């Protein structure tokens, strides 16, 4: 059974200005905490499209949301397919969309899923258990240069080359099969002095591999682009991110759509095509409260950004 404390639960949903008869999309159903809070505000005419690529999360959510099942459509898919999902459901536009990005606590806490550097398990890290690519393939089969690139880009790890070299040397002897085997190899690639600073030495590499396995950043970019088109005028999008790469991507995309295209000089009236698509509701991200942090330490890195659609 999932046990998951949702981060910034009220803020994420309240900023959507929920309408009783509205149609909303939860792109990251997870433990269903946000979904339950939203559904409690929806009337019988309202509807929630709940997306997750993890079938375990969906099965658990059906239990959590059992009193509201008549208002929920569950979709096992990647959120990068929002347009396709809504088309299949004959929904043209929705009133709001929200994301709670990152790994849900249950995925981290179930050792067999291979996300955690604290528990020994087979290298896996697949959010969608039906996909073939896992952390094992990334660690044991990807070329040195490709490993360096993902460690640097997705983990912002300054010892990317040294760690990738250690992985290459170790896997030539025998495959690196478990999370703790990988942790040991990562430690070999980081100077002792640096290992003692900045949290767990494997944290950034595990993040990078997880992002690569699940293609998280490009999936989010695709999804957010589609979400901006899928929301009605005056509807909103809430996004909770957990690391700087996602937050930067979200911030930049909101800024681009808020700015709109460059307007040709000398036009007496600005055509609608040149007006902004959205406005940012909060210029600076909302961060977790002390209360949030007491309930869930993972909220420490969470940032919430909200945008309102203008046309």
Curated annotation (Swiss-Prot):
S-adenosyl-L-methionine binds at residues 32-34, 52, 79, 100, 107. It is an enzyme of class 2 (transferase). One of its GO terms (molecular function) is rRNA (cytosine-N4-)-methyltransferase activity. Gene3D superfamilies: Putative methyltransferase TM0872, insert domain, Vaccinia Virus protein VP39. It catalyses: cytidine(1402) in 16S rRNA + S-adenosyl-L-methionine = N(4)-methylcytidine(1402) in 16S rRNA + S-adenosyl-L-homocysteine + H(+). The keyword rRNA processing applies. The keyword Zinc does not apply. NCBIfam families: 16S rRNA (cytosine(1402)-N(4))-methyltransferase RsmH. Belongs to the methyltransferase superfamily. RsmH family. Specifically methylates the N4 position of cytidine in position 1402 (C1402) of 16S rRNA. PANTHER family: 12S RRNA N4-METHYLCYTIDINE METHYLTRANSFERASE, S-ADENOSYL-METHYLTRANSFERASE MRAW. HAMAP family: 16SrRNA_methyltr_H. This is Ribosomal RNA small subunit methyltransferase H. It comes from Staphylococcus saprophyticus subsp. saprophyticus (strain ATCC 15305 / DSM 20229 / NCIMB 8711 / NCTC 7292 / S-41).
